[in-house]
């Protein structure tokens, strides 16, 4: 995001789009972005339900889209990304698969690097997507503060602390694996 500061710092309206398990991560990201007041308007759209009227009718440079996909190949999400690009809307990708269609189509993005999922429930990718969206929300909040000359609020500080504690929390949870196996 820093490399594209001039472009992304102009975004006032953000749309998050995804399908399947990733739509839940998108909804979480929307709530965080609203809580942190990152944008004037934040919405989440299931890419399968998307239509052309879902983009706000404002200048393209003030609009952004975050496309979230585990595989990076989700056709409905890729379609929304292409619609955004055709309108010169800034598109960011949050994908798990390096070199995927969505990763190649967007101008910037984040690879989750959660590893391959082996189950229907996308727990690893979902967890990684939530963390990445939290970091993206913090970046935009920090940018808004920088441009507006304001300072970080309590919600921002709490989110940063929670993210810093994640490795310890996950380590503790993994340490309970044997106990859970015995109980089960």
Where are these regions (language model features)?
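Anionic-ligand anchoring segments at beta-strand to alpha-helix junctions in alpha/beta enzyme folds, i.e.
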Residues: 1-65, 73, 85-99
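Phosphate/diphosphate-binding loops
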Residues: 63-146
């Amino acid at each position: 995001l820093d490399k594209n500061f001039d472009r992304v710092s102009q975004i006032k309206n953000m749309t998050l789009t995804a399908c399947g398990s990733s739509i839940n991560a998108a909804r979480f990201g929307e709530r965080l972005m609203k809580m942190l007041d990152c944008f004037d308007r934040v919405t989440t759209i299931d890419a399968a339900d998307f239509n052309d009227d879902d983009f706000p009718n404002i200048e393209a440079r003030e609009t952004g889209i975050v496309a979230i996909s585990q595989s990076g190949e989700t056709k409905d999400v890729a379609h929304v990304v292409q619609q955004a690009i055709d309108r010169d809307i800034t598109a960011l990708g949050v994908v798990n698969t390096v070199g995927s269609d969505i990763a190649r189509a967007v101008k910037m993005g984040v690879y989750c690097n959660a590893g391959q999922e082996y189950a229907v429930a996308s727990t690893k990718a979902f967890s990684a997507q939530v963390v990445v969206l939290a970091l993206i929300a913090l970046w935009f909040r920090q940018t808004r503060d920088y441009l507006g000359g304001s300072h970080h609020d309590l919600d921002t500080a709490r989110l940063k602390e929670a993210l810093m504690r994640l490795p310890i929390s996950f380590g503790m949870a993994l340490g309970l694996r044997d106990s859970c196996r015995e109980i089960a």
